[in-house]
């Protein structure tokens, strides 16, 4: 599907939007806190900033891409809605879930904030952050990065970074099987391992659980190559954070479709 095109684009410096319509996006932003009980300090904080394509795509492609973003960012139950309806639906469902999970404890702590000891103010505070950005319009493919942070108590929250990829013409999702020839895994794994060390500082590299990384289905495409994303705890401790490893196209031309 993309073999010669990807290789040629690297050599010639051609980017995907050349000769095609530029994709324009709309950003939907919401930032608010919703109290557990009226007058209380506990709340669920919701921050959303999501880009959705609005121009430069066919109607079916735009709908497919928007639904793909909504499904991974907000939940499958909101697919088929307008993007604004989906965002509002997510907020309402999240607030309901927060209150359902915590209101039963309100008589113990939340109703009597004056009785709390120091450090107890956020005992029932949750936080959700969702940010989605169009990363690249490359060679007939759109890559989108989605960051999701959640905190529902405990020592710290968790962050998830997802790469979403779509065929620009149709809006269909892109997987590794669409990009690489059969049996690509070993060759691509070798290339990823070769670039892992240079993607980290020495201390972080030495802390990894494993250096035998393999393709994990979480990636974005760009002129620079294919960038794989490894999440918190996936190949290293939480302190290292999210790890990105890029393999240039010219190093893996032999396994492209």
Regions found by a protein language model. Name each.
Residues 17-257:
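Compositionally biased intrinsically disordered regions enriched in Thr/Gly
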């Amino acid at each position: 599907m993309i073999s010669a095109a990807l290789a040629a684009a690297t050599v010639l410096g051609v980017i995907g939007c050349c000769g095609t319509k530029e994709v324009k996006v709309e950003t939907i932003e919401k930032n608010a806190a919703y109290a557990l009980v009226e007058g209380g300090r506990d709340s669920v904080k919701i921050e959303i900033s999501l880009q959705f394509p609005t121009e430069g795509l066919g109607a079916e492609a735009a709908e497919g891409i928007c639904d793909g973003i909504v499904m991974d960012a907000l939940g499958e139950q909101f697919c088929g809605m307008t993007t604004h309806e989906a965002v509002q639906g997510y907020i309402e469902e999240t607030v309901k879930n927060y209150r359902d999970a915590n209101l039963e404890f309100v008589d113990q702590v939340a109703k009597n904030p004056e009785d709390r000891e120091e450090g107890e103010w956020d005992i029932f505070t949750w936080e959700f952050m969702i940010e989605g950005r169009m990363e690249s319009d490359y060679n007939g493919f759109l890559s989108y990065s989605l960051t999701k942070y959640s905190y529902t108590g405990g020592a710290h929250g968790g962050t998830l970074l997802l790469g979403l990829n779509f065929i620009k013409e149709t809006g269909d999702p892109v997987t590794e099987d669409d990009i690489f020839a059969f049996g690509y895994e070993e060759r691509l794994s070798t290339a990823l391992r070769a670039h892992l060390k240079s993607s980290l500082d020495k201390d972080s590299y030495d802390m990894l659980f494993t250096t035998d990384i393999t393709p994990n289905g979480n990636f974005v495409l760009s002129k620079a190559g294919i960038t794989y994303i490894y999440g918190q705890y996936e190949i290293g401790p939480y302190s290292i954070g999210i790890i990105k490893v890029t393999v240039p196209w010219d190093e893996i031309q032999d396994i492209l479709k």
